[in-house]
Amino acid sequence: YGNEQGTGAGIKQGLQQAGLKREDIFVTTKLYNGDQGNADKVTNAFNGQLQALGLDYIDLYLMHWPVDAHFIESYHAMEQLYKAGKIRAIGVSNFDNDRMEKLLEAAEIVPAVNQMEFNPTNQERDILTFDQSHGIQLAAWSPLGGGRSLKNPVIEKLADKYHKTAAQIILRWEWQRDLIMVVKSVHEDRIISNSQIFDFELSDEDVQTINQLDEGKRGLWYSDFQWHDPNAKIANAIDHWDDTDPSKPL
């Protein structure tokens, strides 16, 4: 997301101030869609990211989206980085079951993680079940679901019942469903509040109540991008992927 250099500087400063070591923290970054391709291309991109972060290794390296023409060879390149000790775990993002099946058929190493949009109104049940059956951990991006989930009357009622915020109710529900939650905020008070979910537990009945809120409404999916239309002239053309780093030559 163009923030690796700043993140690296923050990590260095934070470790020094807190008296911590590199192994005390867990760092995840992603392979740009525009950097997918053969081993040389992926490796060069990864080395650039490592340099920007100022680190010797990455704890988890994720493929951002499955570029249909390249995700298999890109994953093989990631496997080689894993074997070389540059990555401690490899994973993917936004893989539906069809693409995950294709990847598993070709992969030597099962992805540790599949990062998906997941929240009370978009629960990706089929993908969650498939991933869990293959030992793949689902990590939730957009875990709070925006206003559609946070302002849901059911969530608000549970927040009153447990004397917690709506966000804390949602995050606790996801924690009890064995998910990793990728929560973002620039507000210190919200960051602290979002972490305070371990002093209470939702009842099984309340977990099931939130389970019933699923509407299957994704905020972002393949159909939202022109490059996933097989009839489009730029289908799978990596120089048109939205996250292609503009500072790099195509």
Go through the PLM ranges and name each one.
Residues 7, 42, 46, 71-74, ...:
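Aromatic/hydrophobic pocket-lining residues that form the small-molecule binding cavity
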Residues 8-22, 47-56, 80-82, 104-107, ...:
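Acidic (Asp/Glu)-rich catalytic clusters
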Residues 21-35, 59-64, 94, 118:
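A short, structured active-site edge motif that brings together acidic residues
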Residues 33-37, 68-71:
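Acidic pyrophosphate-coordinating catalytic loop
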Residues 65-250:
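Beta/alpha (TIM)-barrel catalytic core signal, keyed to glycine-rich beta->alpha loops juxtaposed to Asp/Glu
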